[in-house]
């Protein structure tokens, strides 16, 4: 019943564009901290007082903050101002977590209302990170160039607030958000060291960042649709915002004056745009000259329309046939796959050389060894070393940890076209496990393996074979070529920490 109350009240507040009153509802914080909605009090520990706090403290804090003038408060006043210090960090986390839940649910309700009248593909399989690679196999083999874009960060806090201003019209909520950003983050940049960001809720941070980046995508989508006369529904939800429609009137005039002579150069029905982890990829069948135009278009768009400083070096042009693209833990490139076809017509026969383009996905072995080196599994040259911090665990726990890491890496990199690099990673983890156990028992690696045997480490290499033997028993019994092929899984929703080492 209370779950319905949450959505009903959100709907009523959304109709009047008032989100600020929801900050004072305890069930908002129950949703934020995954507590049951039947609990009347949200309990959080604070080591300064030793007792518990309810959301009533948050209500009082918001009232007192609203009466403060944050322009005359500086971070150096933390000893004099009662709002600063450890208690204030707790309050900031609670308020930002509640605000994150409010804007997320409000945005999701808007997304649902938008998608009801449109045919939007819904598939849980598309949530997998690996689902993008079959798409790349079908599309990238016909494309020539890729723009590897490093999306710039906003240099001022007000830019992040403006991203919400045009669809959240509640001035009180925006004032609270602006106050929190200025109080608990660096005054010059939102992207400060981890110590400063840790007091701010990461969900709200990601929402603000994605809302800001969606403004880039809206303008890019508008220009792309105007130039190629193709309609896209994947990002259509962002086209309904008042902010975007307000920009269209201004952009039409700008395009007529500034892009009238060269807008036709952008006509390309083979443009594919992918955004991930603060980066973006723009793949096209255009020539290098046209890709350069897209490159400087992005830079000018960031600087002159969004007031974000950027340089041309943040956008790199990559020719897929010559260079590899570092994308989601894989080095992707397009290579020619030569084939010879013999044809016979009547008494004459001739040979046809045919070369087909194929997407090649390889493991970035150098960066992956660097990640293993930082995690103390090997040195910088890739030689396995023991893991002394795990020596206090039992033998079964140590083996289970190594096997789990090995399986996760094998699972994620199952789409590699060359398995040799994957075997090397397995070898590093396997020998590191043996050295860790040998060091724990104060023995040598040779003596330890001789005493226990090597059967207990077969899990490192047998898991994939067991999976394939269950999936394809007949094929697997006659040939193991399938095991050497590329397999994309549909259950990978996050990148392994060792893979995502940037």
Swiss-Prot record:
GO molecular function: RNA binding
Annotated transmembrane regions: none
Protein name, entry field: Maturase K
Source organism: Theobroma cacao
Alphabetically ordered keywords of this record: Chloroplast, mRNA processing, Plastid, RNA-binding, tRNA processing
This protein's GO CC annotations: chloroplast
Keyword Coiled coil: no
Its job: Usually encoded in the trnK tRNA gene intron. Probably assists in splicing its own and other chloroplast group II introns.
Family, per entry: Belongs to the intron maturase 2 family. MatK subfamily.
Listed Pfam families: Intron_maturas2 (PF01348), MatK_N (PF01824)
One GO term of the biological process aspect: RNA splicing
Compartments (UniProt record): Plastid, Chloroplast
